[in-house]
Amino acid sequence: MLLDFFVLIGISNCFSLIFFDIKIEGFISIDCGATSDHWDESTDIFYKSDKGFIDTGTNNEIAPEYYYSNPDYGRQLRNLRSFPQGTKNCYTLKPEQGKNSSYLIRAFFYYGNYDNKNQVPKFNLYVGLNYWTTVDLQNIATPAFPDIIYVPTSDIIYVCLINTGSGIPFISALELRPLNKSLYPIDEGALYNGWRYNLGTSSDDKDFVR
C-alpha cells in the first residue's frame, strides 16, 4: 500500500467536534507514560494510561520547568514512554469500528529534556507496515503533533516507533478518532497531512487564509 499525500484544511467548528466531544463513539485517547487513567480538564477528554496497549518501554516524567504551557494541551505532555530497548516498539489499537473504516490518528511528542541529556532524538514512526513520518523535533521545548488518516484492512492497528540509531524513541500521547469515510474516500492505506490552513480566523494568525 502506498502512502498518499493530502492537504488537511481545518475549520475550527469541525475540529471541535472531532477532538473535543468525548461523547463521540470510538475515541481512543492514550496518555503515554501515565500511571493511571484521568480526565483532562483542558480538553474534556478521558485519557487512558498506555497499560494494555503496549508492554515495552519505560515511563518518564517531564521536569516542572519544562512543562508545556499551551492551555490546549493538558497533562498528557507532562509524561512520556521511552523505548531504550529494541529497534521496533508498537502500540496495539483495536478501534470499535474495525477494519475498512477511516480513522484520524494523531501522535504527540514532547521531549522536555526528560532524560537530562539536552539532546533531542530522531526516529521513525510507522502505522501498520506504512512509513508515517520521521520525528525530528526542533528543540527540547517544542512539541510535534503529526497526524494521518488511515484505513486498515485488519481490525487491529499497530503504531510503531523505530529506533534509527539517532537517540531513544519516545511518545507523549496517542489518539485515534473515527471519521466519516466520505470525507476522504479511500479503500485502504493512508493519507499523510502535508499542510494545515486555518480559514476565516483572525488576520493576526500567520497561517491565515481566506
Tell where the protein language model's regions lie, with residue ranges.
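Compositionally biased, intrinsically disordered or flexible polar/acidic segments
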Residues: 1-210
